[in-house]
Amino acid sequence: MEKFAAFARIAEIEFADVVLSTQDLGHKLRIYLIDKSFIDLSYTTELEIQRFTIHWERTHIDKSIYRLDNAPDRSWRKVETFPLHFHDKKYDKVGIPPFSVDENLLLKNIFRRFLRFARLQATA
C-alpha cells in the first residue's frame, strides 16, 4: 500500500467540500483546496518517534502559512507543547496548536483536526 493512500482518502472523502484533489509526490502528499491553496503532509516511517509536518501554503492568497509539526526545533523549545508546535500565519509566529492534539493521537486523527481547521479558515 502506498504511504499516503489512507491520508488521500481521508482528504478526498471526509473533506470533499474543500478538497479538490490530492497528489502523491513521493516524499509528501499534496492536497489542493478550493481556494487555490494547498496543504502538504510528510512524515517519517523509520524513526522510533514518528516526526511529521502538515504545512498549509497560502502565501499567494493572503501571505500566510500554517504549519503543525513535531520536529524538535530548539527555536521553539519554550512552546508549552514542545516539540509539537504550530506556525500561525507566519514562520516566526509559533505557539500551541489552535486545536487539541494529544501526544497519543494517531497521525490520521491529527491530520483530520488540521483539515477541520483549514476548512474553517478556507470557508470563512
Which residues does each PLM region occupy?
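Negatively charged, low-complexity tracts enriched in Asp/Glu with abundant Ser/Thr
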Residues: 1-40, 45-49
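Context-gated lysine
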Residues: 3, 28, 36, 63, ...
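Intrinsic disorder/low-structure terminal segments
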Residues: 3-6, 14, 37, 81, ...
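Generic hydrophobic secondary-structure signal
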Residues: 31-33, 39-41, 52, 56, ...
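Generic "edge-of-domain/loop-turn" microfeature
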Residues: 36-38, 48, 61, 73-75, ...
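Generic alpha-helix signal with a bias toward terminal, lower-confidence helices
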Residues: 43-45, 51-55, 78-80, 111, ...
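An exposed acidic His-Trp-rich patch
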Residues: 53-101
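Well-ordered alpha/beta subsegment
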Residues: 90-124
